Amino acid sequence: MVREDPSVNPWLIRIAVDRATGVIVGQVNFHAPPDDKGMVEIGYRVNPAHRGQGYATEIAHTMWSYAARHPDVRVLRANVRPDNEPSRRIIEGAGFVKVDEEIDPEDGLEYVYELTAAGYRARFPT
């Protein structure tokens, strides 16, 4: 994808590294660049040894902040399994609203959350 269109690179996978130790703690990405409606969907994962230390919150907010300030983005989306309470707390705490449910072929039932880019910027101005 990047070879054909290098402009998609900022939307793809990034490695999350602890600033103090240099240890890889997880990864984050958007599933694709903004679609024709201006929507981007985040995906993130924190390695098990580093969970519960605030990394997921920082990772998600770093990417949401980037996307919410991009001129082509109007809607931020996050899908999460109902039993993933830590991620649901992060998403709901950021102001996302559950708008749907869908079945993912790999993960099963997922809740679909959305927040407008303008709504994110209003809640987290910087």
What residue spans do the PLM features occupy?
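GNAT-family acyltransferases
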Residues: 1-41, 46-49, 62-70, 83, ...
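Glycine-centered recognition micro-motifs in short, flexible terminal segments and loops
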Residues: 48-58
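Conserved active-site alpha-helix within GNAT-family acetyltransferase domains
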Residues: 57, 83-99
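Conserved hydrophobic beta-strand within the GNAT/NAT acetyltransferase core sheet
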Residues: 76-80
